[in-house]
A protein has these predicted regions:
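Glycine-rich flexible loops
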Residues: 1-440, 452
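C-terminal substrate-recognition "lid" of short-chain dehydrogenase/reductases
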Residues: 513, 654-681, 686
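Catalytic Tyr-X3-Lys loop
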Residues: 525, 536-552, 572, 596, ...
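Conserved mid-core segment of classical short-chain dehydrogenase/reductases
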Residues: 526-541, 564, 585-588
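Active-site helix of classical SDR
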Residues: 555, 592, 600
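Alpha-helical segment proximal to the catalytic Tyr-Lys
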Residues: 560, 605-606
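Residue(s) in the substrate-gating loop at a strand-loop-helix junction
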Residues: 576
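Short, small/polar-rich loop/turn modules that mediate ligand/substrate recognition or access, typified
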Residues: 608, 613, 673-677
Length: 691
């Protein structure tokens, strides 16, 4: 492992933080980010770092403090505030206590913060405080786990690190672990040995130093030694050169899994969870190992990963060329997995004589030979984190198997972390948004009504695929979203008149989110002309392709996924007032939109047996790009109106905005008992009232 600490980078980094940030905190931030941006060291909020210094208080003068990573911070992006200052001496005084409960410990941490609004310090703060070094770094490096997740981990680590090793047998994070580490460190010094690294059995690595550089460099050195040992232990494996064939289309497996989990209640929301597939060469090669199922059933590489991946994955076995039986097979194996989890929960509660609130029993990681790793989460972030963690778990498992035998923490120890009192306290239900868990695909999403609808669906909690034929518009639309919405959005370029491009857009949705639930088929054009003219007939043909046939391309592709998921779905079409009350010289548009209205109704009839709803929004006179290039002026002139008067010519005398139309689509997306319906969004037009 290469060090990424560069002396030349430090001063500019500190200058960017500003003079108000103490130098020691700036240095702490610099090396914390170096650790956090290397996934072979820590992943997604894992690990923690600290630095000890002095702060000036208006009341107490100089106060010794420890800057320690706060809960919710990610080392990769941590800011100075992510290391809140805590009074050091009161924490060290806690060593005199024989024991301390988790909530009592957290209370001590919070009451000793210098800033009451700061994040809660890490649960491993006391371990950092009890060690004498100025800087302390804690990581869960893959290579370290490969050597300490062993039956003889201590012996292996002593061969690697010699007298510099402080070995600490497994203890769950908290007060007891802090005490044990401090005692082991002091005993090492008392024996006349110089501590270099602390390895926590089946947990991870602690390094330390008087400077940020020294502590960081010790991490890199310790991990490099471990990597070298794993490499020297690697077995020679003869690969066939080809991977196992997928039992069926990977997309079918993804859709069927998502639908199964939705049906069984595997998602915290009513819709299916987000499913992300990883099919790297490393993942597929691991799944081809004859012992892959056994290895994956052993447990998490480090205890806190259980909070993201459950104790074990589901190793899914599917028959080849049995597409009809895929969903039934997946459902049976998911039910079996849940039964095993329920038994584990009951066994652990009984053996420990504790009462806990049971978490859902559904898998977060599903392994399918020939298909890959399927990670499950309530959100894309959750699924991505689980996938990242398990990809690195595979590296740890294979490294540990090369070194000796993969032997991480026991099921009993995993249960203690999974059902930790501090985690149980977080189970208060938060109010979900109307479309939480839903995946929506919106066409024509680069501007106008489509863009507004995508934004509204995201606001309501959905994950959204934005589709448009203009890449620049899509990029701008996504960049304009807030951070929360942007994390649940993806985009892809497609011309919806091209069925192959439409299929590719839906494949993108499957790769990004695992499937789709809601389709807003919005893309279209607004050609004008007389049908009895040669130009009008040509425009009619073009309009039928763009405003009718293209919508069927979208609906057909959606229906394939809806049927494979088996959980219903929602088709929404942007029709138009022109479908029921055509205007003069607007035939190419009105005829195609009338056909689209009939298309919506036909899908309402034909798709109902699959639980699929089909509805439409009839909007009128919304000032979007369709009214550009003189169209608005021409339509207003036909009626003898100014452009502004034209857009307000309705019963309410109110201009209809794209957000108004988006609100109608959002309502229909959640209207579970409504199909074959038209909602008008036109400010009121008696001639266009649905009959």
């Amino acid at each position: 492992m290469q060090s990424r600490y560069h002396d030349a980078d430090v001063s500019p980094f500190l200058q960017r933080l500003g003079a108000e940030v103490p130098e020691i905190l700036g240095l702490r931030t610099y090396t914390a980010r170096l650790l956090g941006t290397d996934p072979a060291l820590v992943l997604h909020g894992g690990g923690n770092t600290s630095a000890k210094g002095t702060l000036q208080s208006r009341v107490h003068g100089a106060v010794d403090v420890i800057y320690v990573k706060g809960s919710g911070s990610d080392l990769a992006t941590i800011e100075p505030r992510g290391h809140p200052a805590v009074r050091l001496q009161p924490l060290r005084d806690l060593r005199t206590l024989p024991s301390m409960g988790d909530f009592e410990m957290v209370n001590e941490l919070r009451t000793n913060l210098l800033d009451a609004s700061a994040p809660t310090p890490s649960v491993e703060t006391l371990l950092h405080a009890f060690l004498p070094a100025r800087f302390v770094d804690h990581t869960h490096a893959d290579a370290i786990l490969a050597i300490c997740d062993q039956p003889d981990g201590e012996e292996i680590c002593r061969r690697i690190y010699g007298d510099g090793l402080v070995w600490v047998p497994y203890v769950m994070p908290g007060f007891a672990l802090a005490q044990r580490c401090a005692e082991a460190f002091e005993a090492h010094v008392a024996a006349g040995r110089r501590p270099e690294v602390i390895v926590l059995e089946r947990h991870g690595l602690f390094t330390f130093g008087e400077t940020a550089k020294e502590s960081y460099s010790r991490t890199i050195s310790a991990v490099s030694w471990a990597e070298g040992y794993v490499a020297e232990s690697r077995h020679t494996v003869v690969l066939s050169g080809t991977r196992s064939e997928a039992p069926c289309k990977p997309s079918l497996v993804t859709h069927a899994l998502r639908g199964t989990l939705a049906k069984l209640g595997g998602s915290p929301c009513a819709r299916g969870p987000i499913v992300q597939r990883r099919a790297t060469e490393t993942v597929l090669a691991f799944l081809d190992r004859p012992d892959a199922a056994d290895l994956s059933a052993i447990g998490s590489a480090t205890p806190d990963h259980v909070l993201r991946t459950k104790p074990t994955p589901l190793f899914l076995r599917l028959s080849k060329n049995d597409e009809r039986g895929v969903r039934a097979s997946i459902e049976a194996q998911v039910v079996e997995y849940a039964a095993r989890y329920d038994a584990y929960f009951e066994e652990m509660c009984a053996s420990k004589a504790v009462a806990r609130t049971k978490l859902d029993p559904w898998p977060r990681i599903v392994l399918v030979p020939g298909v890959g790793l399927l990670a499950v989460g309530q959100t894309l972030t959750d699924a991505s984190i689980a996938a990242d963690i398990y990809e690195h778990t595979i590296d740890v498992i294979e490294g540990a198997a090369d070194v000796g035998r993969y032997a991480p923490v026991s099921r009993s120890d995993l249960f203690d972390v999974e059902y930790w009192s501090l985690e149980q306290a977080k189970l208060k239900k938060s109010a979900g948004r109307p479309l939480s868990g839903a995946v929506a695909l919106v066409t024509g999403a680069g501007s106008g009504i489509g863009k507004a609808t995508a934004r509204r669906l995201l606001l309501d909690g959905a994950h959204v695929v934005l589709v448009d034929r203009a890449e620049e518009r899509l990029r701008d639309a996504v960049l304009g979203l807030d951070n929360d919405s942007r994390g649940r959005a993806t985009w892809t370029v497609a011309d919806v008149t091209n069925r192959t491009a439409v299929d590719a857009a839906f494949a993108h949705a499957t790769m990004a989110f695992g499937g789709v639930d809601v389709i807003v088929s919005n893309a279209g054009t607004a050609p004008s002309g007389d049908l009895h003219s040669e130009v009008g007939e040509r425009l009619l043909r073009e309009s039928l392709e763009q405003n009718l046939i293209a919508h069927n391309h979208v609906a057909r592709a959606a229906m394939t996924i809806f049927q494979e998921q088996g959980t219903g779905g929602c088709l929404l079409f942007n029709v138009s007032k022109a479908a029921v009350t055509p205007g003069p010289h607007f035939g190419p548009y009105a005829v195609a939109k009338a056909g689209l209205l009939a298309l919506m109704r036909q899908y309402a009839v034909d798709a109902a047996p699959f639980g699929v709803r089909s509805n439409a929004v009839n909007a009128d006179r919304v000032r979007t790009a369709l009214f550009g290039e003189g169209v608005a002026e021409a339509r207003a002139a036909v009626r003898g109106l100014t452009v502004d008067a034209y857009f307000k010519a309705n019963l309410l005398e109110r201009e209809v905005m794209d957000d108004d139309v988006a609100g109608a689509f959002a309502y229909l997306a959640g209207a579970r008992a409504t199909t074959g319906c038209i909602i008008t969004v036109d400010g009121g037009n008696p001639a266009a009232f649905p009959r």
